[in-house]
UniProtKB/Swiss-Prot annotation:
Keywords associated with the record: Ribonucleoprotein, Ribosomal protein, RNA-binding, rRNA-binding
Statement: the UniProt record of this protein carries the keyword Magnesium: no
Organism: Streptococcus thermophilus (strain ATCC BAA-250 / LMG 18311)
InterPro entries: Ribosomal_Su5_D2-typ_SF, Ribosomal_uS5, Ribosomal_uS5_bac-type, Ribosomal_uS5_C, Ribosomal_uS5_N, Ribosomal_uS5_N_CS, Ribsml_uS5_D2-typ_fold_subgr
The name this protein goes by in its record: Small ribosomal subunit protein uS5
Domain notes: The N-terminal domain interacts with the head of the 30S subunit; the C-terminal domain interacts with the body and contacts protein S4. The interaction surface between S4 and S5 is involved in control of translational fidelity.
């Protein structure tokens, strides 16, 4: 779900820069791959990757890709509405809501995604592979699965007060 209005300023964070080498007849060709997460700290976040022979160019390409890849994250106050588990490749991510003031208890790539999404209180655990791109993809997949109480009630055909 790409957002066309660039009126809001997006913050960007470089999660990983990888030097990739291709061995050819004439020697080694080196390139850089960048993984960047962007967000407005207000419920919108996205990630992108870029490759180039120069690091700044790879980062620029990744930021452009990330801006085209924004998703909306439903929030309840400063946390997420419910617990969610998601997988991508070998990476598994568990996200749990936390009480207000608890802060973001998350490592590296997960922290970048949830902070830029604007989630201030969350607990997370990364299991399996710790490859940054797969962790970021699993985290974003988990955030996509989140539903507000109103949405769940509507799907079940009951009122929000009957959900408990």
């Amino acid at each position: 779900m790409a957002f066309k209005d660039n009126a809001v300023e997006l913050e960007e964070r470089v999660v990983a820069i990888n030097r990739v080498t291709k061995v050819v007849k004439g020697g080694r060709n080196m390139r850089f791959a960048a993984l960047v997460v962007v967000g407005d700290r207000n419920g919108r976040v996205g990630f992108g990757t870029g490759k180039s022979q120069e690091v700044p160019e790879a980062i620029r390409k990744a930021v452009e890709a990330a801006k085209k890849n924004l998703i909306e994250v439903p929030m309840v106050g400063t946390t997420i509405p419910h617990e969610v588990r998601s997988e991508f490749g070998g990476a598994k991510v568990l996200l749990k809501p936390a009480v207000e003031g608890a802060g973001v208890a998350a490592g590296g790539a997960v922290r970048a995604v949830v902070e830029l999404a604007g989630v201030a209180d969350v607990t997370s655990k990364s299991l399996g592979s710790n490859t940054p791109i797969n962790i970021v993809r699993a985290t974003v997949e988990g955030l996509k699965q989140l539903k507000r109480a109103e949405e769940v009630a509507a799907l079940r055909g009951i009122s929000v007060s009957d959900l408990a």
